[in-house]
Amino acid sequence: MKILKFENLGGEIPLLFENDASLPAIKFRLVFRASGAICAKNGVANLVCQMLDNGTASLKKAEFASLLETRAINLQAFCGAETFGFEILCLKEHFLYALDMLLKLVDEPNFSDEILAKVKDEICAEILDLSSDFDEVANDNLNKIAFANTPMAFNLRGEIADVENIALSDVREFWAGLNLANAYVFLGGDIGENDEKFRQKIAQILAKFKFGVARNLPKFTSKSDLFTHQKVQSEQAFIYFCAPFDVCEDELFIAKTAMFILGGGGFGSRLMEEVRVRAGLAYSCYAMAKFSHATRMLKGYLQTKNENAKDALNLVKKVINDFCENGVTQDELDAAKAFLAGSNPLRKETAFAKMAICESEFYDGKEFGFGDKELEKIKNLDLQTLNNFIKNHDEISKLCVAIVSANDDENL
């Protein structure tokens, strides 16, 4: 993959380009960094994303969708915690048409009172439906205590009250805030580097946004040693937990190895073996590193019977404390190295999967091939270095915990 650029739009916009003619298909992404849900009023980014699934002001949803479907074009807006953007995946023969449709969408999005009301109703219905998804509830409750009074405390959808209070002016303000200073373009597949008809059309799409001033994502740190419980009618207890994980850049490969051994590796990982296999206290138990531009943390979860919730949580805490105090064994390190090295080719089975890895490396500010270099560091990681790292990061034992169960509080 190479980095090209678009110019004459108020500044330079990076273009991540990769030619691969193994399939007659093209993937396009326009990504606005520092423009996702945590950068906006609660619920607004997700609502705007869903409004963009309702066609244009002149081509309503059914007609717009039909024109895409007859050509097997996948065109959609997407919204994450940190990013907002558009994606196209289609056959090469329909790519120019797909770009035309995206140009129509960004030129006259269907931001009307009617569509706003419709989408608000749909999102509120979704929120109500998810209120009985206790994994979702436990995760949301965890974020509310771990990141209280920050945008990280809320999920992409927001609360019903947040959604109901969104006005059309909020939608237009968010849309106007998408600027090219924070954007990049990804273009990969069966396409030439110098194919001007495509580049010109993409430039027309970019020109619909102002260049603006680059924004940086805010940083958030998880709180420690907090607990919340919500009593519900359920046959199971849902336990979610997190802790801050203050890792510097040159330690990331060590952190990933450590977390794989602790709880990210499924069967064979420390938590799964102790909590499920030996003690029989959970159906599953995981913990992994969550590293993003906005936060770095350990996050985990498990499900168990209501009557086992207290014992299961206590065992999780014991396992993590022991992990921090005593580290790992050489056998565990060797097994982690073998799995991580062996599974790496599976991440690159398709051309678009390889391109996605390169895009992720670019987004993280790394050079292309960073992941392979990191894997080499993992292969050469020695036990003493790993265990010293683990002992220096006992902050991961200071858990914030959210439980959703049928238990009374005094039984937890």
Q: Where does each model-flagged region fall?
A:
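Charge-rich, well-structured scaffold segments of protease-associated domains
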Residues: 63-213, 245, 278-279, 284-412
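His/Glu-rich zincin catalytic helix
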Residues: 1-64, 172-274, 313, 398-412
